[in-house]
Amino acid sequence: MASPRLGIFCCPTWDAATQLVLSFQPRVFHALCLGSGTLRLVLGLLQLLSGRRSVGHRAPATSPAASVHILRAATACDLLGCLGIVIRSTVWIAYPEFIENISNVNATDIWPATFCVGSAMWIQLLYSACFWWLFCYAVDVYLVIRRSAGRSTILLYHIMAWGLAVLLCVEGAVMLYYPSVSRCERGLDHAIPHYVTTYLPLLLVLVANPILFHKTVTSVASLLKGRKGVYTENERLMGAVIKTRFFKIMLVLIACWLSNIINESLLFYLEMQPDIHGGSLKRIQNAARTTWFIMGILNPAQGLLLSLAFYGWTGCSLDVHPPKMVIQWETMTASAAEGTYQTPVRSCVPHQNPRKVVCVGGHTSDEVLSILSEDSDASTVEIHTATGSCNIKEVDSISQAQGEL
């Protein structure tokens, strides 16, 4: 579970609100974290094996899009962060004597405090990087649709995601543990920067990503209408697929992390009270404990739920391969009509070979749409670029295709 309270636990003194949640059934809480994290790792491994098996039956992609690299990086960050939660919870359950020495000021063994700080910073860093990568994904898909030239720079995204994650994590840790671990958490002036650096990437994703996704969906609709000047049923289905994917992403993020925001709001409210153990605050205390346990279950499950949002429910099966709907679009050609309508993506010019289309600066419009609807090898919709008329294969019905989503 990714929470700034994990870092505060390493301090010898806790505020009353932190004491309220950290001392309430700690073994049960870490058992829930361990179970949720282990389930995410096991099912994630099954999904990875299933994806590799399905890739073996396809021609390898020549140049993966930047969004594919971004999703792989976000998945890796979430996987390693979840692994940190599993290791931390395992130690908490298996070695209670080791954990008791963490907050002991007079203890001579530095390893308990070192493990506490290291595991807390490890979890915070990787989940922060995951949030930055998800923000980069929203930015990238919007830029791919909107701009007319150039190619996404994955190096810039690496610098942005890892640089900001490391910077905020180090700054929050220095402010929290200054001047030393044995003398930290002596007031809100030390703790607040730690909270800000922890939740800033999360709040950015929850606020900015829906805006970028909405703008992308609007641009995709304009792009599909501009291909032939009409908006066919297949193009409506294509737009619905992209819109559904973005909706699933935000639904997972809100479901997994809204409990963190509610919990921290309740704990901050309790910290402002002169006596948090008053009878009038009993319901708020119970709500804080409840959301604390919900965080322990949902935070490690984020990666699994996001992968299901991207790849579908059948991604966790090693044998089930759902029928795919293959839509072949006509490639764009240089014409007078294109001169009157400037598409938001890179223009394409036909060469001598009628089966090939040369892209000026990057992906064709078909590939751009494929990036948005098929970031995985297990997507329910595939789009292939080909000349000629529109040809639909393996389509039972549009309602069945929407049912698979």
Curated annotation (Swiss-Prot):
Disulfide bonds: none annotated. It holds the Pfam family Ocular_alb. This is G-protein coupled receptor 143. PANTHER family: G-PROTEIN COUPLED RECEPTOR 143 (PTHR15177:SF2). The keyword Transmembrane applies. Residues 1-27, 100-124, 175-191, 270-292 are extracellular. One of its GO terms (biological process) is melanosome organization. GO terms for cellular component: apical plasma membrane; cell junction; Golgi apparatus; lysosomal membrane; melanosome; melanosome membrane; nuclear body; plasma membrane. Its main location: membrane. It comes from Mus musculus. It is found in: Melanosome membrane; Lysosome membrane; Apical cell membrane. It comes from the Eukaryota. Belongs to the G-protein coupled receptor OA family. Residues 49-78, 146-153, 213-248, 314-405 are cytoplasmic. A motif (lysosomal/melanosomal membrane localization signal) lies at residues 222-231, 329-330. Receptor for tyrosine, L-DOPA and dopamine. After binding to L-DOPA, stimulates Ca(2+) influx into the cytoplasm, increases secretion of the neurotrophic factor SERPINF1 and relocalizes beta arrestin at the plasma membrane; this ligand-dependent signaling occurs through a G(q)-mediated pathway in melanocytic cells. Its activity is mediated by G proteins which activate the phosphoinositide signaling pathway. Also plays a role as an intracellular G protein-coupled receptor involved in melanosome biogenesis, organization and transport. The cytoplasmic domain 3 and the C-terminus tail domain contain the lysosomal sorting signals and are necessary and sufficient for intracellular retention and delivery to lysosomal and melanosomal, respectively in melanocytic and non-melanocytic cells. Residues 221-238 are annotated as: Necessary for its G protein-activation ability and normal distribution of melanosomes. The gene is Gpr143. GO terms for molecular function: dopamine binding; G protein-coupled receptor activity; L-DOPA binding; L-DOPA receptor activity; L-tyrosine binding. It is a multi-pass membrane protein.
